[in-house]
Curated annotation (Swiss-Prot):
UniProt organism field: Frankia sp. (strain FaC1)
Family: Belongs to the alpha-IPM synthase/homocitrate synthase family.
Gene3D superfamilies linked: 1.10.238.260, Aldolase class I
Cysteine pairs bridged by disulfides in the record: none
GO molecular function: homocitrate synthase activity
The protein's name: Homocitrate synthase
Keyword field contains GTP-binding: no
Reaction equations catalysed: acetyl-CoA + 2-oxoglutarate + H2O = (2R)-homocitrate + CoA + H(+)
Protein purpose: This protein is a Fe-Mo-cofactor biosynthetic component.
Length: 401
């Protein structure tokens, strides 16, 4: 199997350096499928894994070997496609799970251990000493079986930082390839994330991964803060699919890293909308969804449309490179520039003196119908049909970029 290169920057490098490369571990097929009501068939898992591999994801957390025979069979099928991405099996810190992962032919396993006292005591009735022994023994078990092993610290945001730091150092010594810091219930904020995670990276150098949940709408922000603090891996899902409020969306994280932090992101971002449609179906669930939503490149305000027509960067932070299309809509907030442009697309040239009354008609019609106007109906506002006024519909003027 040809595995995509997963070398890491040196521990002295900060992720905000221009040459720093951030790696993606996508967990749509594991954490994403744990969202209530989500259940992928084997064929769907194969298709999604193939699409993630095609866009350049470095690791795909493809399932849970310990779930049973069916899950292990799907993992084997994914491995049989010979992906460039590393295929990872998610495991509890349990020798039975390690054995199950090895039986699939996986070369990479991810082990999870709770590190907060809340989880250890309330969920497992265990203590920190047990967690140390358990995860260390399972790491050794996995490496003895010839697997690359990473470890995730569950509920790290509510854990004692000193304990996490000590445990991380011990696990580095026994050969873990990477450590994952999980904000399991989304309690982190970007400022504390930058502070806490920066101290952690400095104390225990090496590859770290952030796994953020979106319970307070901060998963993407916390992921970006972690990268700024020195983390070199990010855990994501398509559209943020996941338990409760979900995870950090791959499309948001990738575009933020590329356009806000100016980091090299070696993913095919032009396929993000296609990937999202494959995972959740068509149409996409939210028009206002960041990066891939239907309304991300839609403009109605007269001031905005005027600016877009002169230079798209005036009101777009990035081009529709993710597979989207620019839409200039006509509605209540449209001005003369918007209407003139829409009419020109219909082959109509309006005199400047005609535009103002036509704009008023458009605004009245949009208010009455509570939606934008279809540019195909705008000829009804010309001299021949002005009395009828514009008809309401859906804004459909699209411009591929």
């Amino acid at each position: 199997m040809t595995v995509r290169e997963t070398r890491f920057p040196s521990s002295s490098a900060t992720a905000t350096q221009p040459d720093a490369v951030v790696r993606f571990c996508d967990t749509t097929l594991r954490d994403g499928e744990q969202a209530p009501g989500v259940a992928f068939t084997a064929a769907e898992k194969l298709a999604i894994a193939g699409a993630l591999d095609a866009i350049g994801v470095h690791q795909i957390e493809a399932g849970i070997p310990g779930m049973g025979v069916t899950e292990r069979d799907v993992l084997r099928e994914i491995l049989a496609t010979d992906p460039k991405a590393e295929i990872v099996g998610w495991c509890r810190a349990d020798h039975r799970d390690v054995e199950a992962a090895a039986s699939c032919g996986l070369v990479t396993a991810h082990l999870t251990i709770p590190v907060s006292d809340l989880h250890l005591k309330s969920k497992l009735e265990r203590d920190r000493a047990w967690a140390r022994r358990r995860v260390r023994d399972c790491v050794v078990d996995g490496t003895d079986r010839g697997m690359r092993v990473s470890v995730g610290f569950e509920d790290a945001s509510r854990a004692d930082d000193a304990f996490v730091t000590d445990l991380a150092g011990e696990l580095r010594d026994v050969g873990v390839t990477r450590l994952r810091w999980a904000d399991t219930v989304g309690l982190l904020d970007p400022v504390s994330a930058y502070d806490r995670l920066g101290r952690l990276v400095r104390a225990v150098p090496g590859p770290w991964e952030i796994h953020a949940h979106d319970d307070f709408g901060l998963a993407t922000a916390n992921t970006i803060a972690a990268v700024q603090a020195g983390f070199t891996w990010v855990s994501t899902t398509v559209l943020g699919l996941g338990e409760r409020a979900g995870n950090a969306p791959i499309e948001e994280v990738a575009m933020a890293l590329r356009h806000l932090l100016k980091l090299p992101i070696d993913l095919d971002t032009t396929s993000f909308r296609t990937l999202a449609q494959l995972v959740v179906g068509w149409p996409l669930p939210a028009g206002k969804k960041a990066v891939v939503g239907e309304s991300v490149f839609a403009h109605e305000s007269g001031i905005h449309v005027h600016g877009i027509l002169r230079h798209p960067a005036t009101y777009e932070p990035f081009d529709p490179e993710v597979g989207g299309r620019r839409r200039l809509t006509v509605g209540k907030h449209s001005g003369r520039a918007s209407l003139r442009h829409a009419l020109e697309q219909c082959g109509i040239t309006a005199e400047e003196s005609e535009l103002e009354p036509l704009v008023e008609q458009v605004r009245l019609a949009a208010t009455r119908h509570k939606r934008g106007l279809d540019s195909r109906d705008l000829p009804g506002t010309s001299r021949a049909g002005r009395d009828a006024g514009p008809r309401a519909g859906t804004p459909t003027r699209e411009e591929p970029v």
